[in-house]
Amino acid sequence: MGNGETLSIFPHLAGTFHYFFNHVYARRPFRYPEAVIDTCLGVFDRQDYPLGAQVGFAEIDWVFCLTRSLQQSGHRFGACRAALASFAARYVPFLSGLDASNQAFDDLHQLFGAMCCLAELQQAAPGLIRTEQPLKLVLDRRPFI
């Protein structure tokens, strides 16, 4: 790099998500869930990636890695809950504030990622996201994105 820029670990975390949802579907444990939690919290705290500012998959990548690692280890539970609450407080208003004509809604794949993120948040942190009916966690039924 040489120009003072630093590389983010986030792309690697996002790639890991694709392995993790298959591990969950196969009911297999993650390796090193505590390290994944530390990485997720670090990405969030350092703002390594603009989470909660787009309709897409980055958000589900981060939320899923954090929540499912937390289910397996309980490591830094309070910090995880605080990060999820902070993220939801930013992400839900962002999505709610988008105009229906926004191009983000034209891409069904990206919209699916956003909906998966909301469903994961709703399950992992009850009360953060309220809907008339619970959102369905598609990744628990079919591990494919």
Which sequence ranges carry the predicted segments?
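Terminal, non-catalytic domain-edge segments
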Residues: 16, 22-44, 54-145
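Active-site loop segments of alpha/beta catalytic cores
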Residues: 3-11, 26, 35
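Solenoid-like repeat scaffolds
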Residues: 5-9, 40-50
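Short intrinsically disordered, low-complexity coil segments enriched in acidic
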Residues: 1-7, 54-57
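Generic helix N-cap/helix-start motif at coil->alpha-helix transitions
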Residues: 11-17
